[in-house]
Amino acid sequence: STLADGSTDVTTGSFHTQSRLIPFKFGDGQEYVLVVEPADTTISTQAKIHVYYTGSRVAVLTNGVDGNSFNITTSNIADIRVAQTFDVMIMVEETMPPLQIVRGTSHTDWAVSDLNFDFYPMVNFSFATTLTPSAKTGTGINLTLSDGNYTWIQDNFPNGHVGAHVRLNAGLCKITSINSDSVTAVADVIEDLADTVASTGNEWELTAFSNFDSTIGGGYPRSISFHQNRLIFGGSRDKPQTIFASQSGDFFNFKPTTRVVSGSDTTGEVTDDAGFVFTIASDELNIIKHFVSQQALFIFT
């Protein structure tokens, strides 16, 4: 029902006992309540998001129905964090890809899916494996692993390395295929490499968020905020003390450089509005669990 102050009163008795109520404010007079209901294998129910507006349910989003996809369960719903800008709300939790809930052109038009990054953040996972490129420019170059036990996974990103980005020797590559030995990846150069020397395991970087297990390096962020015109993620599974910031004014682009073409050279330059990654240095492990954006970004561990 709609209360005297214009707020929405939602009766939750018919929902799963672990359901979450989350406000979604698109603008004045356009306030919604999202009832997020987790999947529960013990009673064979799917995850659902119920959308309420002025006291009435105007939409129901069900995982696996009408293109909606969200892996919200009884085991992770309590740890979900959200941030919203205009008609998009983003949900994060360390075991699932970031989700985007989008309000369309009307009160009843809603969709939920994995967040579509223009460019994922990148990070070094301190692999004990050297990576050597076969060329500085071009398509179809080889990226060969040695001196360690890291291997390429022959599957499409985020389940495998095909489609993932690799940063090494001041350049950027995108993997297009994996050889059968899982030691050599074939890649296209996006930004020219400075040279073809071997890059040690603590130097080359890989796409930060993925379904890879901890032996490979990946996971998803625990915390989220919009701050000073950037989208901020924090505390991923395998980088629990790290902050990932998007480019300024380009929320879904975490690229740390701007692509510059000069003649036959294509390079990446670091600019003030570029994305960045920052890891908190401390004498003990402090997992980033929450952000509050005010004049400064407050980080809670």
Regions found by a protein language model. Name each.
Residues 15, 30, 45, 85, ...:
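Repetitive beta-strand solenoid architecture
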Residues 40-52, 97-102, 239-248:
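Structural motif
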Residues 53-130, 172, 189-190:
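Beta-strand-rich solenoidal segments
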Residues 26, 31-60:
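Nucleic acid-processing catalytic cores of prokaryotic defense/repair systems
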Residues 10, 59, 103, 110-203:
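Autoprocessing Asn-cyclization modules and mimics
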Residues 30-42, 87-93, 231-235, 289-301:
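Short beta-strand elements that form the blades of beta-propeller/WD-repeat-like
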Residues 2-24, 59-73, 119, 203-301:
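Beta-propeller and closely related beta-pinwheel folds
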Residues 94-96, 181, 191-193, 237-239:
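Acidic glycine-/aspartate-rich tracts in secreted/extracellular proteins
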